[in-house]
């Protein structure tokens, strides 16, 4: 029971499997004799779902720690720079209905109650435009850094849009060639259990039994180990988040030098929403919708209307919104879709993989006895994180004022809103969201994210007595400083297209 965990077997490739392998291998020197041995087994016949085309800024640190070159990553993964999410037609459904959720916290956040002063001091501007420079950079199609900036550095916080299929292959090559991960292409035909109920080995078609101390399930919707072998129950959240189907389409640009958006665009529709992601060579688009509120044929018509009758083929993806009751059971932990999946409204899928793999990494090398403690903590933390993701995504629907379809009306019914979110909304009628409302040091959505969505969607607060933190003079100072930074950045930054083209041709200066 006190034997250290030295052999990790990851089942399944794609972004989940290879990102997990890279995060673990980089820290635990998988390619050296004293390091942890990491083996990834994947079927040669199974294609990853490949919908995760948006990341969070955390991906920069993750890739840098893995020893990846940002130049190589952008070139080989068809990656572009992302600075925010933009939500169109979510509030009223009109053409001018739009707000931003940028990656930078509000300027002056935590120093003064910006929300209480925004409407009085800047009534003609949206909240995000007053407190952050990034909505203006996105609106002007600008990049987050200068052409001369080194890898990973920036003047504006950024993440990426990427080709998920190319990303998985890029990580595979890096993990095998640079980090010592053993790659086996084979079919897993069964699971052999140890006397204590753990997984002892995987039975494969051509490589015999593959033994391990810790098994990581990255098999996607099939959840081969955690779901099928161990039978860990699945918790559906479809009564809260209705979207259960997606139609995805890849759309070419009309010209090779077409602008590349530095923002993920989410446009609300009668039964869901359309994502629109800009890559250097194409756009990734799709309609996420509730099959209880529209038909597949109608959904495809809506998507093609949005794309102005683009005649390419659409790929249908069925979503069972929810997650496993526990994510780590005995000596098996699920990462990625095998742990759970919901609509990609705030691009949390890849971020959850990063967080999952990072916690596994930080607890190694553990003993089998210590694994009981680690798994308990892991399950507690990720159940909390899943609950907060569901809350945050539901918030977008709860605050909508749309009345044009049953989908939007049903989303505001009290019985569909998590109790935790209802209690927070009642508190926030009298004060802005605070870090005190959340319990994790690494919140998946911090208080500043709630500010952007609440005030972007017109959330009204009750009149309260003024406090010292409502200082209008200090708020005006921060608003003016943000305006000054915005003007400076607009003058000095290249377009997203210019930066990407220069990077692909000449590379980025390495620190």
List each language-model region with its residue ranges.
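N-terminal Rossmann-like FAD-binding beta1-loop-alpha1 element of flavoenzymes
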Residues: 6-35
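Glycine-rich FAD pyrophosphate-binding loop
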Residues: 25-51
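Dinucleotide-binding Rossmann-like beta1-alpha1 core, especially the glycine-rich loop
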Residues: 47-138
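Low-complexity, highly charged intrinsically disordered N-terminal segments
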Residues: 96-170, 174-178, 218, 230-233, ...
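Predominantly flavin-linked oxidoreductase catalytic cores and closely associated redox partners
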Residues: 149-299, 357
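Conserved FAD/dinucleotide-binding core of flavoprotein oxidoreductases
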Residues: 268-319, 340-351, 363, 371
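Short FAD-binding loop at a beta-strand-to-alpha-helix junction that anchors the flavin cofactor
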Residues: 327-345
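Long, low-complexity C-terminal extensions of enzymes
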Residues: 362-511
């Amino acid at each position: 029971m006190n034997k250290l965990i030295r052999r990790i077997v990851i089942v399944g490739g794609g972004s989940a499997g290879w990102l997990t392998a890279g995060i673990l291998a980089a820290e635990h020197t998988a390619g050296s004799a004293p390091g942890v041995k990491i083996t990834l087994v994947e079927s040669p016949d199974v294609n990853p779902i490949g919908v995760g085309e948006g990341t969070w800024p955390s991906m920069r640190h993750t890739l840098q720690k893995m020893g990846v070159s940002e130049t190589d990553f952008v070139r080989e993964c068809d990656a572009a720079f992302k600075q925010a999410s933009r939500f169109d037609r979510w509030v009223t459904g009109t053409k001018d209905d739009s707000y931003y959720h940028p990656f930078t916290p509000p300027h002056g956040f935590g120093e003064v109650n910006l929300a209480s002063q925004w409407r009085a001091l800047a009534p003609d501007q949206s909240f995000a435009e007053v407190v952050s420079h990034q909505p203006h950079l996105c609106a002007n199609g600008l990049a987050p850094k200068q052409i001369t900036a080194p890898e990973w550095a920036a003047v504006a916080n950024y993440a990426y849009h990427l080709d998920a299929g190319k990303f998985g292959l890029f990580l595979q090559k890096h993990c095998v060639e640079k980090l010592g991960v053993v790659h086996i292409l084979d079919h897993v035909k069964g699971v052999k259990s140890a006397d204590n109920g753990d997984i002892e080995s995987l039975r494969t078609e051509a490589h015999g039994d593959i033994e391990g101390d810790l098994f990581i399930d990255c098999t996607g919707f099939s959840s081969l180990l955690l779901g099928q072998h161990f039978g860990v129950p699945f918790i559906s959240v479809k009564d809260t988040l209705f979207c259960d189907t997606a139609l995805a389409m890849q759309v070419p640009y009309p010209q090779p030098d077409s602008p590349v958006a530095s923002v993920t665009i989410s446009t609300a529709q009668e039964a869901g929403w359309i994502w629109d992601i800009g890559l250097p060579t194409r756009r990734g688009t799709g309609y996420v919708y509730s099959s209880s509120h529209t038909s597949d044929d109608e959904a495809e018509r809506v998507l093609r209307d949005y794309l102005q009758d683009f005649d390419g083929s659409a790929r249908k993806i069925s979503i069972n919104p929810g997650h496993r009751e526990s994510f780590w059971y005995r000596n098996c932990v699920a990462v990625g879709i095998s742990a759970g999946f919901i609509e990609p409204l705030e691009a949390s899928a890849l971020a959850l993989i990063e967080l999952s793999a990072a916690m596994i990494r930080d607890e190694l090398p553990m003993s089998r006895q210590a694994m009981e403690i680690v798994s308990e903590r892991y399950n507690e933390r990720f159940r909390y994180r899943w609950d907060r993701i569901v809350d945050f995504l539901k918030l977008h629907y709860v605050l909508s004022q749309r009345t044009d379809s049953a989908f939007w009306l049903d989303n505001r019914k009290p019985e569909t809103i998590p109790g935790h979110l209802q209690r927070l909304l009642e508190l926030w009628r009298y004060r802005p969201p605070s870090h005190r409302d959340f319990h994790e040091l690494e919140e998946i959505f911090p208080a500043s994210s709630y500010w952007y969505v609440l005030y972007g969607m017109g959330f009204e607060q009750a009149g309260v007595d003024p406090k010292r933190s409502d200082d209008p003079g200090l708020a005006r100072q921060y608003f003016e400083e943000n305006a000054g930074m915005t003007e400076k950045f607009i003058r000095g930054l290249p377009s997203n297209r210019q930066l990407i083209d220069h990077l692909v041709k000449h590379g980025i200066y390495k620190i």
